[in-house]
């Protein structure tokens, strides 16, 4: 299914929230969408790993890392785990690492920046709660659409047949 956030905004602007353009794409998949699953943690990724061990089919993990770019919340090992468990993508309000490996893993990843320092592996944090960054609030069960142009959020699934009929 083709995703184009620009065209989705043309069709559904009154139904979507547009995330501030603060993210870059780092994964092997450039466009992805799915139902939001949230996690909030600061410079730790143990809880992220627990969540990525779940079946992620049709889901996108939205990580509120407090905007910290001092430690990477996602690395190649976690990205492979996510891909193996069929996650559609990961949005990280924080840092990631091991870019040369991430670009070869079949998952969409958007993050603020890379840094070589790993996160602490403790599992402090909260999951399935509303998180706020990039000018929007992400609620569990919202729908997220991402590509190289940007990230948009909707409370209801968007009809992608509108794009793919062209």
Swiss-Prot record:
GO terms for molecular function: endoribonuclease inhibitor activity; enzyme binding. InterPro entries: RraA, RraA/RraA-like, RraA/RraA-like_sf, RraA_gpbac. Transmembrane segments: none annotated. Gene3D superfamilies: Ribonuclease E inhibitor RraA/RraA-like. Keywords: Cytoplasm. GO terms for cellular component: cytoplasm. GO terms for biological process: regulation of RNA metabolic process. It holds the Pfam family RraA-like. The keyword Cytoplasm applies. Homotrimer. Binds to both RNA-binding sites in the C-terminal region of Rne and to RhlB. Belongs to the RraA family. Globally modulates RNA abundance by binding to RNase E (Rne) and regulating its endonucleolytic activity. Can modulate Rne action in a substrate-dependent manner by altering the composition of the degradosome. Modulates RNA-binding and helicase activities of the degradosome. This is Regulator of ribonuclease activity A. It comes from Actinobacillus succinogenes (strain ATCC 55618 / DSM 22257 / CCUG 43843 / 130Z).
């Amino acid at each position: 299914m083709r995703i184009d956030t620009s065209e989705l905004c043309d069709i559904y602007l009154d139904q979507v929230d547009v995330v501030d353009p603060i993210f870059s794409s780092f994964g092997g998949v450039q466009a992805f969408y799915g139902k939001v699953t949230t996690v909030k943690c600061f410079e730790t990724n143990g809880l992220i790993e627990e969540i990525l061990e779940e079946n992620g089919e049709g889901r996108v993990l939205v990580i509120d890392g407090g905007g910290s770019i001092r430690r990477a919340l996602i690395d190649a090992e976690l990205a492979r785990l996510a891909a193996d468990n069929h996650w559609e993508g990961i949005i990280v309000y924080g840092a990631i690492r091991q870019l040369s490996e991430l670009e070869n893993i079949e998952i969409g990843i958007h993050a603020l920046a890379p840094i070589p320092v790993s996160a602490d592996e403790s599992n402090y944090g909260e999951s399935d709660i509303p998180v706020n960054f990039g000018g929007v609030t992400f609620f569990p069960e919202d729908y997220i659409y991402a590509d190289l142009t940007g990230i948009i959020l909707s409370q209801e699934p968007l009809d992608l047949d509108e794009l793919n009929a062209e």
